[in-house]
Regions:
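Sec-dependent signal peptide recognition
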Residues: 2-12
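Hydrophobic h-region of N-terminal signal peptides that target proteins for export
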Residues: 10-20
Length: 200
């Protein structure tokens, strides 16, 4: 099973980034724009059939495949809407990684039935790779702030199963974020990952 997971992750890591649907020319506060922005955090074969939630967890579109797409930015949405999809930090999560996200936001221990996966093809605004819940680069550990482009995340049922991976995010290889904490997970860069930071 472990070797299967390694080969599966390797195939994702080397695959090209899937083309997102065309951004609608409408207000970023609109239901149509939000559905586009959040659902394109995953490849279309996942995002097109996923449930889409807004920042208040209200359903914008009911899905059919068990995945949920929503903004991942914990900061309040501006009155005029997010500037772009990157600022919204949207995620598309399966059932298990959604449990992980809820535990992370409530500072409780994730209780998963299996490993979970979460897509973020629009990237994020930055994280301290060593410490959870650091919102600003000025508060981060020196040299450990990374603003990510497109990536996939593996949220492990047991963090020890990924403990042997590097924490170095500068190599282009999958790496550990929040190592040693209950929120340790594997970051898997895909094409475009370093568009907001220095490439290897």
């Amino acid at each position: 099973m472990y070797l299967y997971r390694v080969f599966f992750l390797a195939s994702l890591w080397t695959a090209p980034l899937f083309a997102a649907a065309t951004e609608p020319d409408t207000s970023h506060q609109s239901k149509k724009w939000q559905i586009w922005a959040y659902s394109t955090a995953a490849p279309s074969f996942i995002g097109d059939s996923a449930t889409v939630l807004d920042q208040n967890n209200d359903v914008l579109r009911q899905g059919t495949n068990g995945w949920t797409c929503m903004p991942g930015n914990a900061r309040p949405m501006p009155q005029t809407g997010w500037d772009d999809a990157h600022q919204a930090m949207p995620v598309c999560a399966d059932v298990e990684s959604l449990k992980w996200m809820q535990a992370y936001l409530t500072e409780t221990i994730p209780q998963l039935n299996r490993d979970g996966f979460m897509w973020m093809l629009h990237g994020d605004l930055g994280e301290d790779n060593t410490t959870p819940m650091v919102m600003h680069q000025a508060d981060s550990t020196d040299g450990h702030w990374i603003e990510s482009g497109p990536h996939l995340m593996l949220m492990p049922k047991d963090p020890q199963t990924i403990a042997g991976h590097t924490t170095d995010f500068r190599t282009g290889a999958p790496y550990l974020m929040f190592a040693g904490s209950p929120y340790a997970h594997l970051m898997i860069p895909v094409e475009g990952y370093y568009q907001y930071s220095t490439a290897p």
